[in-house]
């Protein structure tokens, strides 16, 4: 059974998609055992509590620098015997030592079709603002492995979503979450859990 940690920084809608998929039996060989939040008071922790999943706050603000935070996070996840780390709206940077410690065990969902609108500065609404400014007709989401290059790891799954006339960054963000992120993130976790058997 794949021991899964989900890392969050906000409301946890992608976490909820994973919880729902697990409850529906769609993650056959995996279990979310812990949710780690990079700041206190985020709604994702309430979602974890409601699902009976341990929630831990490891606040980035409590650590002097990225290296200290990354080391604390690495130690916590090793203590929890984590097999797969899912970054689900985790807005905190970690260092290269962390990504190497969990090589091919960290995945991220990015709200665009990589290699478009990815890398440094492309997160949250910034991604959708850039897509609309560029005039693309299709955007979407990508689940990829995490390595030392921001949004540069191997792609696992992608799903395209049409950009509609009159879209705002907020409407495009919502459509991509509903039609792509909430679908392909659980699919990717399921695939990786089956490979883990």
State where each predicted segment sits:
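N-terminal Rossmann-like dinucleotide-binding module
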Residues: 1-43
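Short, surface-exposed acidic-centric catalytic microdomains
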Residues: 29-68
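Conserved acidic residues
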Residues: 33, 83, 104
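Glycine/small-residue-rich loop that forms an oxyanion/phosphate-binding "nest" at active or ligand-binding sites
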Residues: 67-77
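Glycine-rich phosphate-binding loop signature in dinucleotide/nucleotide-binding domains
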Residues: 77-83
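Donor/substrate-binding cores of folate-linked one-carbon enzymes
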Residues: 88-192
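Conserved small/polar residues in nucleotide/adenosyl-binding loops
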Residues: 195-197
């Amino acid at each position: 059974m794949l021991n899964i940690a989900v890392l969050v920084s906000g409301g946890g809608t992608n976490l909820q998609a994973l919880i729902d998929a697990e409850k529906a039996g769609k993650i056959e060989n995996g279990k979310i055992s812990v949710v780690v939040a990079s700041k206190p008071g985020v709604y994702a922790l309430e979602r974890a509590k409601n699902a009976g999943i341990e929630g831990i706050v490891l606040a980035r603000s409590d650590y002097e620098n990225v290296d200290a935070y990354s080391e604390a996070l690495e130690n916590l996840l090793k203590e929890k015997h984590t097999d797969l780390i899912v970054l689900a709206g985790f807005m905190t940077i970690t260092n290269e030592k962390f990504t190497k410690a969990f090589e091919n065990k960290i995945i991220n969902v990015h709200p665009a079709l990589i290699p478009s609108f990815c890398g440094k500065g492309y997160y949250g609404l910034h991604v959708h603002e850039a897509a609309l400014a560029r005039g693309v007709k299709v955007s979407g989401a990508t689940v990829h492995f995490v390595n030392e290059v921001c949004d540069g790891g191997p792609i696992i799954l992608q799903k395209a979503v049409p950009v509609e006339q009159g879209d705002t960054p907020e409407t495009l963000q919502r459509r991509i979450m509903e039609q792509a992120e909430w679908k392909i993130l659980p699919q990717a976790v399921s695939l990786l859990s089956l490979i883990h058997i």
